[in-house]
């Protein structure tokens, strides 16, 4: 997909949704705490659950982004996605990096298929490693690639590896932007803006938690109903964010692309066309899960309103 994108001057897929992907574990956990808090009818229990839950998320988020080696607190899928993107870039590196977990598994599977076609019995495959072990391998692979990049570009351009989520986020974003159109004059402002955005989102989440705790303490009013409204509207927020990034891709075209096309808005859902390339964009089952949860939360809102009305009437 990225190969097609760069022909028309679009940035790689890894250049989009950078903040959203990095903060998604904490945001989803936060939404879960909000729903649980909204379901609690007793105020002390509600405030206690939300206070403990939010404090744990803040600690987890802070350790992930700003502590040395904090990347290990991210989920395996996120770290694996970084590795997948770096594997796609391997062809442009001077020295081929060590095979990652994904590449090793693919090579093993291909070898097994070839052995079966020849009528041979493939050697027993090793048992799948645990997610924590795989994540450690992914992080080590990122560290090796980071250090090679530091040796190539110089210690002034690339700081020493500390393994924090914040450092890896910005470095990987810069590498993604420069995969096909390596123009530092264009890339540096984008990386700087993403750095500011990461701090804004980090402290914005903390501020939002304080507001929600205030609403939970009151047990009524608009801040209280946000506990259910925000999770229920998650599919809407997803479509807005997804559409915004599609707009960004279509309006941030690089002049170094092989084809010259006018800025465009890619099709959000359905089939579309960019130059002579066809596009297909359809929701996956995860979007269906969000819709189901929205309906469930809407029913919770109706029941809670009836409960509050009965309490007020009594």
Positions of the model-derived regions?
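Membrane-water interface of alpha-helical transmembrane segments
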Residues: 192-198, 218-228, 277-287
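Hydrophobic alpha-helical membrane-insertion segments
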Residues: 54-68, 226-252
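Cytoplasmic juxtamembrane regions at transmembrane-helix boundaries
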Residues: 27-59, 213-230, 297-314
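Long, glycine/tryptophan/cysteine-rich extracytoplasmic
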Residues: 1-21, 66-194, 242-284
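Short, low-complexity cationic-aromatic patches
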Residues: 23-25, 47-52, 278-285
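Long, compositionally biased interface segments
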Residues: 270-314
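Hydrophobic alpha-helical transmembrane segments
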Residues: 20-38, 195-213, 288-296
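Conserved, well-structured core segments that form or line functional sites
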Residues: 201-208, 222-236
């Amino acid at each position: 997909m990225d190969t097609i994108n760069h022909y028309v001057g679009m940035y790689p897929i890894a250049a989009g949704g950078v903040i959203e992907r990095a903060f998604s574990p904490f945001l989803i956990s936060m939404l879960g705490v909000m729903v649980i808090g909204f379901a609690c009818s007793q105020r002390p229990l509600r405030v206690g659950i939300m206070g403990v839950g939010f404090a744990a998320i803040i600690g987890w988020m802070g350790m992930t982004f700003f502590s040395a080696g904090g990347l290990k607190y991210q989920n395996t899928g996120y770290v694996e996605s970084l590795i997948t993107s770096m594997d796609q870039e391997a062809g442009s590196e001077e020295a081929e990096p060590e095979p990652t977990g994904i590449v090793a598994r693919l090579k093993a599977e291909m070898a097994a298929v070839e052995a079966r076609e020849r009528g041979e019995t493939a050697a027993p495959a090793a048992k799948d490693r645990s997610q924590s072990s795989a994540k450690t391998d992914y992080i080590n692979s990122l560290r090796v690639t980071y250090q090679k990049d530091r040796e190539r570009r110089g210690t002034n351009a690339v700081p020493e590896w500390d393994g924090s989520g914040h450092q890896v986020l910005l470095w990987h974003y810069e590498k993604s932007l420069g995969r096909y159109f390596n123009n530092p004059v264009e890339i540096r402002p984008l990386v700087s803006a993403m750095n500011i955005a990461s701090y804004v989102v980090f402290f914005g989440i903390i501020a939002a938690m304080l507001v929600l705790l205030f609403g939970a303490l009151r047990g009524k009013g608009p801040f209280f109903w946000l506990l259910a409204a925000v999770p229920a509207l998650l599919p809407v927020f997803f479509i807005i964010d997804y559409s915004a990034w599609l707009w960004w891709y279509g309006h941030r075209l690089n002049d170094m692309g092989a084809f010259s096309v006018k800025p465009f808005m890619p099709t959000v859902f359905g089939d579309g066309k960019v130059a002579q390339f066809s596009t297909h964009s359809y929701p996956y089952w995860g979007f269906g899960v969000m819709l189901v949860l929205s309906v469930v939360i809407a029913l919770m809102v109706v029941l809670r309103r009836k409960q509050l009305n009965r309490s007020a009437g009594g």
